[in-house]
Swiss-Prot record:
PROSITE patterns: CBM1_1 (PS00562), CBM1_2 (PS51164), GH10_1 (PS00591), GH10_2 (PS51760)
Residues annotated as domain CBM1: 23-53
Region (Disordered): 56-84
UniProt keyword annotation of Signal present: yes
Name listed for the protein in its UniProt record: Putative endoglucanase type F
Pfam families: CBM_1, Glyco_hydro_10
């Protein structure tokens, strides 16, 4: 596989083979293959990234390399290279990503790893409501812009995180008790966020940690108290109107056991109901904050849990915030192989690069140690791919 990648990198554009499934096939500045293999179609994800997806063969005309006026373009769909992301794409997936934020951008050891190993980034905090709109109609984008600019300049896909969440929510939103006011506030916040980054975001976590309590019922929050279930449709429809090309997700934690109420009577049942009602939900994000093998939600439960989520009517699923207490090589392999085995699973994002920067520092849950050296789990994934 490495030899093939080198040969493709050295070949002239005219000699490039057709792009494989999930491979890049166009976008502003793209100079690689612009047709897809048989049985695939070239679909626009955003202005800079077109991707080969299952469907009728052939391709539509793509932007030439002169379009875009020098605008940075993500090349995360390129299957060349030897990092985790490139190897994962070679197995038919869209990305292997990580979480960063603006305060990581001057950390050279961390950023060098991101550039070499990961093809997608999620912003840890700077896109959350308290950071973006601390007071009504007063938006602050500077820190989120830094992450988006880094990603586009370095060819990384972006997951927008997050539009609605009951935590990190300004007090002025929590104090709203009027249905029409809260509806207008949600619509304005979502429209403003999604419009600003239109064409740059692959996936949005439209609703995050917000939907379900552990028994599968709606979580108590200002959104559910004032609007009931309706806040879901309000948020998703506003996001779809603002950027029809972005994939829209419900993202939640503790979706790691196939028979757990939060998975069955919570996520799967409600997503099916909402999709049937016309709410534009594209995907389910399972965060994957996992325990060690003896804990409540070990990695061993993930394969069956992913299959249960994939049995829903959502078009795709993703593992969005993966970290595992102890970072056992076997546990990471279990999760990666579970995603590889489920066609709807489009990608994995680990929740940070190094244990030094993890929100769970005592658990040492990531692929790199506190000195930014690869751990056994990283080596196991790289070797398995």
């Amino acid at each position: 596989m490495h030899t093939l990648s080198v040969l493709l990198a050295l070949a002239p554009v005219s000699a490039l083979a057709q792009a494989p499934i999930w491979g890049q096939c166009g976008g502003n500045g793209w100079t690689g293959a612009t047709t897809c293999a048989s049985g695939l179609k070239c679909e626009k994800i955003n202005d800079w990234y077109y991707q080969c997806v299952p469907g009728s063969g052939g391709s539509e005309p793509q932007p030439s390399s002169t379009q875009g006026g020098g605008t940075p373009q993500p090349t995360g769909g390129n299957s060349g290279g030897t990092g985790l992301d490139a190897k994962f794409k070679a197995k038919g997936k869209q990305y292997f990503g990580t979480e960063i934020d603006h305060y990581h951008l001057n950390n050279n050891p961390l950023i060098n790893i991101v550039k070499a190993q990961f093809g997608q980034v999620t912003c840890e905090n700077s896109m959350k409501w308290d950071a973006i709109e601390p007071s009504r109609n007063s938006f602050t984008f500077s820190n989120a812009d830094k992450v988006v600019d880094f990603a586009t300049q370095n060819g990384k896909l972006i997951r927008g995180h997050t539009l609605l969440w009951h935590s990190q929510l300004p007090q002025w939103v929590q104090n709203i008790n009027d249905r029409s006011t809260l509806t207008a506030v949600i619509e304005n916040h979502v429209k403003t966020m999604v419009t600003r980054y239109k064409g740059k975001i692959l996936q949005w976590d439209v609703v995050n940690n917000e939907i379900f309590a552990e028994d599968g019922n709606l979580r108590d929050s200002v959104f559910s108290r004032v609007l009931g279930e309706d806040f879901v449709g309000i948020a998703f429809r506003a996001a779809r109107a603002a950027d029809p090309a972005a994939k829209l997700y419900i993202n939640d934690y503790n979706l790691d056991k196939s028979d757990y109420a939060k998975v069955t009577r919570g996520m799967v049942a409600h997503v099916n109901k909402w999709i049937a009602a016309g709410i534009p939900i594209d995907g389910i994000g399972s965060q994957g904050h996992l325990a060690a093998p003896s804990g409540w939600n070990p990695a061993s439960g993930v394969p069956a849990a992913l299959r249960a989520l994939a049995a829903s009517d959502a078009k795709e699923i993703a593992i969005t915030e993966l970290d595992i207490a102890g970072a056992s090589a076997n546990d990471y392999l279990t999760v990666m192989n579970a995603c590889l085995a489920v066609p709807k699973c489009v990608g994995i994002t680990v929740w940070g690069v190094s244990d030094k920067d993890s929100w769970r520092p005592g658990d040492n849950p990531l692929l790199y140690d506190s000195n930014y050296q690869p751990k056994a789990a990283f080596n196991a994934l790289a070797n398995a791919l």
